[in-house]
Each structure stands twice: as C-alpha cells, then as structure tokens.
A protein has these predicted regions:
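Rossmann-like dinucleotide/phosphate-binding beta-alpha-beta segment
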Residues: 134-225
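Glycine-rich nucleotide-phosphate-binding loops and adjacent flexible coil segments
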Residues: 230
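Rossmann-like dinucleotide-binding domain for NAD(H)/NADP(H)
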Residues: 226, 235-333
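An N-terminal-biased, well-structured beta-alpha scaffold segment characteristic
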Residues: 1-94, 216
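Short glycine-/small-residue-rich Rossmann-like dinucleotide-binding loops
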Residues: 51-52, 199, 205-207, 233-234, ...
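Structural alpha-helical scaffold elements that stabilize or flank donor/cofactor-binding regions
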Residues: 39-40, 193-194, 219, 283-284
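Phosphate-binding beta-alpha-beta segment of Rossmann-like dinucleotide-binding domains, i.e.
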Residues: 89-91, 97-145, 157-160, 164
Length: 333
C-alpha cells in the first residue's frame, strides 16, 4: 500500500524501512502535514504522521479528495487528530499505544538528577577549566516526596525507579494501581494534596479538555516553595506563562521539560541559523534552573523499533481490512 510518511526524520527512517521489509511503498516526506503539503500524498492510499502533524477538519476533507481514508500515527497520543470527525467520515485511524515506557521514565528521572546535581552547569564549567564546586550543591533524592500525576505504563516505571532511590511516592490517577501500592508503597491522594506535599512533581497523563493546563497559576500556588516540576508527557498539560511566573517568584525551584505546548514548527528542526521567534520559549531558556530537551524522551533504539514494527503492522491491517487492535475510537485523548 502506497503510504505518505510525513515528518519523516533521519533518526527513524532506517527503523521504519527495516520493519517494512519492502511490504509497502513508503514515500518519506520531510515536511510536516499541512494544507500546503497534503498534495504530496497524491496517489497514496494512506498517510503516516508524527506527533506534531495536525489532522483537523480541513485536512480530513483534503484527504478524502485524494481518496485516502487510512491514517497511521507514529505516536501513542492522538490529540493532534480530530478523531470524532475522522470516524464520522469513515477514516481508519490507528496509533502506537506503547513503544517503551522505560525510555520516557528513564528520561524523566535523568532530568530530575541533572537539575538537582546541576550537571549541565558542572560540565560547562569544566570546559572552561573552572573546577570550583561553588553553587553546584544538590539534595539527596532519598527521602524526598515525589508526586506522580498519572500512573499508566510510564508512571508505573517512574514509581519503580524512584522507589529504588528511597523516595516517598504519592500519586494521583482516576484508577489506583493496587500492584504499585504493594510493590512501591505508593499512596494515592487527591490533586490538592499531591501539589501541597510533593518535593518533585512529574507528569505522566494524556492531554484532554480536563487535563489541559492542569499546571496553572492556581495549582502552582498550592505547591511547595522550591518544587521541582518535570514534564515528559504532553506540552498542553502546562500553562507555560504560569510556570515562568512560578520560576520568577521562586515557587518553582527547578523545571525540566521534554514537551512544549507550542512545539510544532520548533522541535525536530534545526533553527541554529535563524532568530527564535517564540518569546515564551526564549524566556524559559534564559533560566539557569530550567533544563529543556526537544521531545526526545522516547528516543531509544528499542522505542524506534517498536514504533516502526507497530506502524507497519497497522498498515498491514489497513490493507487487509482487518482489526489491528490499535484503532482509535471516539475516545478522550
């Protein structure tokens, strides 16, 4: 089946090509999917999209013009797709529900440790032959209270890792995980309590109308002074301007993020020769206690292999008109 693979990146093409094994005719397109690039999918039977490719009502109509009714997502999240209209119009949409919870969990813990022990600053000093330790002090993770908001597959791995550090773990989720309670001594609390008690807060939940900007001015006010905030989940969970105000007031002592609400057109691209136009992001970059990575928490060989394998499986099922088990129905993101 001829498939247009939008937002294709060098780091993933080999994995996808290997998993495909010449089964489908894949057209790798570097550009992201948009009203201006959709015609590049002409004569294709399916499109394959990445996390920042938006499929809204306009794109759906244009896909119908090209007789394309199959959409394969190279991601677990699907808030960038108008699922309700897609289903009404008869589109088949499938995602990669799980690729490697370990990769994202490990990255989140890496952000915690790097912020705490000021690893980036220490490295930069060494490069300048400055071996002073002044200002590089951190704290013991052991004994700290970590609040995990969302205990799905990634949140569970976070709990297991940090339990090994000797952290006290509290969590918030609509569904309490009984195994985590027993294995990691996790205590489930309400949102107000997790904000008030946590020394470190880490987000691991989907983006929906209910969770959008769950980190906002009101909830930041409830947090401990000097709290560490980590987001490797969805950029839209955070009101970035409120976080900036929280950092300026020193309510937020550390901020680590791998996702950004307005990352489309910014992340996954080389802008080193251009002027940054996003003033909010530029302000974040100016803080010494902020550590940013560009949506790379998933980026391990294992995850890339799993994403590629599942994506090709979904395309196979589209072509054979059978269920893959990864279809997206009219669900909340």
């Amino acid at each position: 089946m001829k498939t247009a693979v939008f937002s294709s990146h060098q780091f993933e093409i080999n994995s996808i090509t290997k998993a495909n094994n010449n089964k489908h005719e894949l057209v790798f397109i570097e550009q992201s999917l948009s009203a201006q690039t959709i015609d590049l999918a002409k004569n294709c039977k399916a499109i394959c999209i990445f996390v920042n490719d938006t499929v809204d009502a306009t794109i759906l109509k244009k896909l119908l013009v090209h007789n394309i009714k199959c959409i394969a997502l190279r991601s677990a999240g699907f808030n960038h797709v108008d699922i309700i209209n897609a289903k009404k119009l008869g589109f088949k949409v499938a995602r990669v529900p799980e690729y490697s919870p370990y990769s994202v969990a490990e990255h989140a813990v890496m952000l915690m440790l790097a912020l705490n022990r000021k690893i980036v600053h220490a490295h930069n000093r060494i490069n300048e032959l400055n071996f002073s330790l002044n200002g590089l002090g951190g704290f013991d993770m052991h004994g700290k209270t970590v609040g995990i908001i969302g205990t799905g597959k990634i949140g569970q791995q976070i709990a297991k890792i940090l339990y090994g550090f000797g952290c006290k773990i509290i969590a918030f989720d609509q569904i309490e995980n009984e195994t985590l309670k027993k294995q990691c001594n996790v205590s489930y609390v309400d949102l107000k309590s997790i904000f008030a008690q946590a020394d470190i807060l880490t987000l691991h939940m989907p983006l929906s109308q209910e969770t959008k900007h769950i980190i906002n001015k009101k909830n930041i006010h409830l947090m401990k002074t000097g709290v560490m905030l980590i987001n490797t989940s969805r950029g839209g969970l955070i009101d970035t301007k409120a976080v900036i105000d929280g950092i300026k007031s020193e309510k937020i002592g550390y901020f680590g993020m791998d996702v950004y609400e307005d990352e489309g057109g910014l992340f996954f691209e080389d802008h080193s020769q251009t002027v940054l136009q996003d003033d909010v992001f530029a302000r974040l970059m100016s803080f010494q206690n902020v550590l940013i990575t560009s949506h790379q928490a998933f980026l391990t060989e294992t995850a890339l292999q799993n994403i590629a394998t599942t994506t090709i499986h979904n395309l196979n099922c589209f072509e054979q008109n059978i269920q893959s088990g990864n279809e997206i129905e009219n669900l909340k993101n």
